[in-house]
């Protein structure tokens, strides 16, 4: 299934039903009073989060949504039926933005959570309500109100505890496959990962969610490559793993590669740059010898002061220990 994380849709809530003008007319009640009922309220439109939905693809092809109108009132004080509400099912982590103001107006962050997008029109009232001591046969009623109209943008930001960041072919997809049951495509060419992937990492009785996004390249903050579009999925992560290929197949410099990604991250968002971040040195199985020494030299060259981990995602070496350390960090953050 294609991954879609941003769509624009048009919403029209239902119109309220009109009130009714009617008078009681029975064989032995020739001068019965007013008995016109109220109309029904128009239907509203809601977002509803569903943990089993992973993309906004359904809203890519259908862009306009209408809730049901309320029915008009009837005689004998019968109220019109209210218009049925419409629920748009979206992934957990979906935000809503008003197209006119570009301001965020709501979000759904938990399974089953709802958010009202547009309100249905209020019902009209029947002539029964206008009876008075001076007007026993009112012909006055009110029309139902129009439903609210709005054009909105839906944005999906994946809800992950840990997000993987790095250049294409750094081994992020292999890492998430090695520690979870996620199955992103893996191959030796750039941008194997075209869309984000989520994997649940289990550590004993605990578990956390890891996200793999397409690799970041130089110029991503200005729109180069695929990274810019998907960097937003890191914003809700509790920590970021910067995955570095210590032995690039294209013989590029790991030090330069590290700083290229860090630079793009800072340019994109200072808030994202300030998130807790850990260094993961991957593909140590490709180093001929002196693995620890070469990794230490790399860390010193980039001036890294935090925790770092050396792994071979392909050989599943060091990945269990990495998962345990991440789980410990996340448990402390709760």
Swiss-Prot record:
Task: Output the Gene Ontology terms for molecular function.
Answer: GTP binding; GTPase activity; magnesium ion binding
Q: Per the record, what is one GO cellular component?
A: cytoplasm
Positions of the OBG-type G domain: 160-331
Cofactors per UniProt? Mg(2+)
Q: Could you list this entry's UniProt keywords, alphabetically sorted.
A: Cytoplasm, GTP-binding, Hydrolase, Magnesium, Metal-binding, Nucleotide-binding
Chain sites annotated for binding Mg(2+): 173, 193
Top-rank EC class of the record's enzyme: hydrolase
Q: What is its EC number?
A: 3.6.5.-
Q: Do you know which Pfam families this protein is assigned to?
A: GTP1_OBG, MMR_HSR1
Q: Name one GO biological process term.
A: ribosome biogenesis
Subcellular location(s): the record lists: Cytoplasm
Establish whether keyword Hydrolase is in the entry. yes
Q: Does the keyword Magnesium apply?
A: yes
Domain Obg: start-end pairs: 1-159
CDD domains, from UniProt?
Answer: Obg
* Residues that bind GTP: 166-173, 191-195, 212-215, 282-285, 312-314
Describe the function of this protein.
Answer: An essential GTPase which binds GTP, GDP and possibly (p)ppGpp with moderate affinity, with high nucleotide exchange rates and a fairly low GTP hydrolysis rate. Plays a role in control of the cell cycle, stress response, ribosome biogenesis and in those bacteria that undergo differentiation, in morphogenesis control.
Q: What does the annotation say about its assembly with partners?
A: Monomer.
Q: Which family does it belong to?
A: Belongs to the TRAFAC class OBG-HflX-like GTPase superfamily. OBG GTPase family.
> HAMAP family this protein is in?
GTPase_Obg (MF_01454)
Protein name, UniProt field: GTPase Obg
Please state the gene responsible for encoding this protein: obg
